[in-house]
Amino acid sequence: MSEKHLTYADSGVDITKEEKTVKTLIDKLSYVRKGIGAPLTGIGHYAGLLDFGEYALAMTTDGVGSKVLIANEMKRWNTVGIDCIAMNVNDLLAIGAEPVAFVDYLALEKHEEGFAAQIGEGLLKGAEISRMSIVGGETATLPDIIKGFDLAGTCLGVVKKEDILEGGKVRVGDVLVGIPSTGVHSNGYTLVRKIIEKSGYSYHDPCPYDSSKTIGDELLEPTRIYIEVLDVLKACEVHGLAHITGSGLLKLRRVTKLGFEFSDPIEPQEIFKFLQKEGEVEDLEMYRTFNMGMGFLMILPEKDAAKAAELTGGKIVGKIVESGIRVKDLIIE
């Protein structure tokens, strides 16, 4: 074992440089439409919001990322369509919008027997869970550009203007209700693959903690779609929502500048413990890269917290404080 602790940057993904690239791109996007369809917010939240009378249209775009490389290695593609839809739908839910339509973009190196049917199977399952239609898409064969394949999509949602959740309602003392993830979901896979490479394991090896499935099977567990959050929005007073994806708990800064104190966090699944041990990854790096067992967070007044937890299978994990992000004694920010 090396004494060096593996980081996301070591695996090839430097979040700081990525943020600078995104900012440079956004700075060039100065044109703003007026009238119907005009943006209601700036770029940078979970979804873009467009004026549509009494309602706002919400739009997200996202992809599966390098998780598709594990799907290729396993020759198992029937779950990545769920991931593609989940990454978009969960971002819509995080601003209070209901998903209504989806289009996908599939770029591939070559056509392989059984591939398209399995991709379609996953997309269909994700759409059914999300209660929305897939209304189109694009497939491109790009052997000079793509090695393997890439899968992404764009999702459209609707929300009444008065029901938009951008974080402005969050107050000190609000209760945090976390909803469990199904595992790694669809972020941090460049680091995951680096860890597996370093460990000497293969994706076809049995999980050390569950021999009934392989490491590859565990890593291909599809991202949970948190559609039940819509039930919470109808039944409870919700002040804020967060989809915990890339950058881990640092993603909470999209919601509020106030602090998050996780005094009773959700226990990370065994896959995170395995990855941390094999990669010798420090606690801080884990929480700044992965969801660590909690894929979605709801922020509510105390009176509604228990109800929200009941509706989603979640649990009360902490509260809003003045500043910082802390998981027990671990300072994230």
Swiss-Prot record:
The keyword ATP-binding applies. It catalyses: 2-formamido-N(1)-(5-O-phospho-beta-D-ribosyl)acetamidine + ATP = 5-amino-1-(5-phospho-beta-D-ribosyl)imidazole + ADP + phosphate + H(+). It is found in: Cytoplasm. One of its GO terms (biological process) is purine nucleotide biosynthetic process. Gene3D superfamilies: PurM-like C-terminal domain (3.90.650.10), PurM-like, N-terminal domain (3.30.1330.10). Keywords: ATP-binding, Cytoplasm, Ligase, Nucleotide-binding, Purine biosynthesis. It comes from the Archaea. GO terms for cellular component: cytosol. Disulfide bonds: none annotated. Its EC number is 6.3.3.1. Pfam families: AIRS, AIRS_C. Its main location: cytoplasm. One of its GO terms (molecular function) is phosphoribosylamine-glycine ligase activity. Pathway: Purine metabolism; IMP biosynthesis via de novo pathway; 5-amino-1-(5-phospho-D-ribosyl)imidazole from N(2)-formyl-N(1)-(5-phospho-D-ribosyl)glycinamide: step 2/2. Belongs to the AIR synthase family. NCBIfam families: purM. This is Phosphoribosylformylglycinamidine cyclo-ligase. It comes from Methanosarcina acetivorans (strain ATCC 35395 / DSM 2834 / JCM 12185 / C2A). The lineage of its organism: Archaea, Methanobacteriati, Methanobacteriota, Stenosarchaea group, Methanomicrobia.
